[in-house]
Amino acid sequence: MDKEKDHEVEWLEAQKIEISVDLLAAAKQHLLFLETVDRNRWLYDGPALEKAIYRYNACWLPLLVKYSESSSVSEGSLVPPLDCEWIWHCHRLNPVRYNSDCEQFYGRVLDNSGVLSSVDGNCKLKTEDLWKRLYPDEPYELDLDNIDLEDISEKSSALEKCTKYDLVSAVKRQSPFYYQVSRSHVNSDIFLQEAVARYKGFLYLIKMNRERSLKRFCVPTYDVDLIWHTHQLHPVSYCDDMVKLIGKVLEHDDTDSDRGKGKKLDTGFSKTTAQWEETFGTRYWKAGAMHRGKTPVPVTNSPYASDVLVKDPTAKDDFQNLIQFPEVEVVEVLLEIIGVRNLPDGHKGKVSVMFSKTQPDSLFNAERRLTILSEVGEKQVATFQCEPTGELVFKLISCSPSKIPVSREPKNLGFASLSLKEFLFPVITQLSVEKWLELTPSKGSQTDTKPISLRVAVSFTPPVRSPSVLHMVQSRPSCKGSCFFPIIGKSRLAKSSTHIVDETQTEVITLQIRNSADGGILKDDQRQVMGVTDSGETRVLAVYTGSFWSLLDSKWSLKQINASTADNPLFEILGPRVVKIFSGRKLDYEPKHCANLRSDLDFMTLVEFSKQHPYGKTVGLVDMRFGSIEAKENWLLLPGIVSAFILHTVLKKGGSEGFNVTTKDIKEESKQTKLVAATENNVNANSTNVETQTAITAPKKGSGCGGGCSGECGNMVKAANASGCGSSCSGECGDMVKSAANASGCGSGCSGECGNMVKAANASGGGYGARCKAAKASGCGGGCGGGCGGGCGDMVKSVNASGCGGGCNGECGNMVKAA
């Protein structure tokens, strides 16, 4: 108890650190600026970047000097051009170098006081007028059509005051940062408030190290790093605050990028984690603050032309309420079991914790296992997504040692629960908790001793809307070769129906293709997609016009794009918005650490292009193999499911009805661009720059839920170096695959028919295909999807792992062990 009080005292001392900037408000401004820059990616590289650096040195900094020196100039606020503000931003993120450059050329540090950001909609007229007077030959806004690199080089070498700091490299180091902090939860007040408090804790560790003459490289998580960057963007305040705290300007070293095991970043993060937890008694790793992995490959390098005509979004939509779909919220959870106390005297078994939810939901309905830090001496965390409802239940189990090679039933020592609602409703009071939970003894356990307690650490992200997932289920019983439905000819297709169901197996609508062969009023070669609601209402949802499909009474259209390369979109959905359909998993759906679990050829990504998102934003994913669509926004649900239905039908059929591309064509194109990525055996750790080496392990013998099995498993996967889902299955598995050494994913050794495969109604997470109930599901890809919030549900053991990050986020729902 005294130690807990010491931890509390240390934390309170850290919170006394004085910061002369409103970091919460400044962080929101910072995020808005990064978002704006990301919409103008010409600032990241190329001639425009070179010109921006020249303008920064030749125009902006001298203007800033005049503004601070002259009373006539300093009336009102300055608003820098976007390109100059971006270079200034990157220069300030090396505070020691920025200060020395300013002192060398201008005799003092140039501050941002009196300067407003170009992205706030602030009036630029006064600054533009001043700019024109000082630089009549240089327009205020960068002219992208008039850039001469030779001229820039000559002018730059002629500048008397120009930093020698490599600003091109600085920009390239900072460009990927926005991806790490771009998710919506980062901009919430509660997340940023806790980030500011954690930043003070981070500074407190640095102060302690200096006082003890300890040379430690402290590495921040991304929430802390965001606030640290924000502080540095106020150069004078940052300088004064740091000198007051540690006697010097704290350097921000972003030049290290080697995330290899044992390298500076890896060891730095491990030591920072250990020092934080020893000093404050709380966990350093935090949900939503870890490294997300590498920035996804863009789908285009050319910004969207916003002059493309789209249909009036305000026009009356008679189909708006045709389907009813409940909105579901989701939180990301990071869980660690810290310790156990009051175990019975003489207890000799190995203890671990099984965790689940009292109210299993569409995102998390499995039971998973975690080791206990105090018992095994190495860190293991679980990160997963779930609905912010119900309670997390923790069951302490004990496995007794035995010399007999017969598995014994683990002994249940008791259980405890933690309410999610307590922290998230009606208002979010905190995003992390670490506490002792007293266990309720199981039946038959001793009750005359002190109650056993578990110390549990949980952190959450603020709730956000969960993507909606709809599945297409063929009314015919045949399921050979595909869990979706076989396309076996026009006449039979026209008479069959496809039921659209949600995650709870509730039918949303039924779709059917009607063609001229069925008789009636349709003209030759005309096709219609009919929809029947649960109330019995029948509507025409799509009509094939001869060259494209007209959807929802011409409000939307679906047509094929003549793609010149495999990287280009294959189809386009046009309406009030512009959506392009790409083969494979792109952007946010890009596979990270489970690439071999499912082939990219099974998927199509829906990407919206707009003025707000000129390089595209993912809005949905179609699983062509198992017949499902994930929609991130409600407006996509109906046009998306109708389009997915048409695409699957036409592509499987061999290409017709306006589309001359087939699934075979897509596969051939995809091979050219290597759409199937190799499985990465790295768990991206921490924060700014850390990624750790991992080893995915499987048990030598199938032993219930050991090694990453969630749900009810029969024979477990036997694989020396199984990757992907080799050692992990969620749901109810019958005879599981015994795969050979180096088996990749769940597919190896599972050719076509897998015995009793996953009962998909119970699968959770992002394994999109694992939703159809099939006695003989084709392949294994969709059969291993559940677990903790994503494609794989793997358990990952990592020696000396320095964090959780990208390997535990979204796609994989991994468990991570770290020494």
Swiss-Prot record:
One cellular-component annotation, GO: plasma membrane
Induction note: Up-regulated upon salt, osmotic, glucose or exogenous abscisic acid treatment.
Assigned keywords, A-Z: Abscisic acid signaling pathway, Stress response
Phenotype of null mutants: Increased sensitivity to salt and osmotic stress in germination and cotyledon development. Abscisic acid hypersensitivity.
InterPro entries in the cross-refs: GRDP-like (IPR009836)
Coiled coil segments of this chain: none
Pfam families: C2_GRDP (PF25334), GRDP-like (PF07173), GRDP_C (PF25335)
Keyword Transcription regulation in annotation: no
GO process terms (BP): abscisic acid-activated signaling pathway; cellular response to osmotic stress; regulation of abscisic acid-activated signaling pathway
Function, in words: Plays a regulatory role in abscisic acid (ABA) signaling and tolerance to abiotic stress during germination. May be involved in the regulation of the ABI transcriptional factors.
Protein's name in the database: Glycine-rich domain-containing protein 1
Organism the protein comes from: Arabidopsis thaliana
Recorded name of the encoding gene: GRDP1
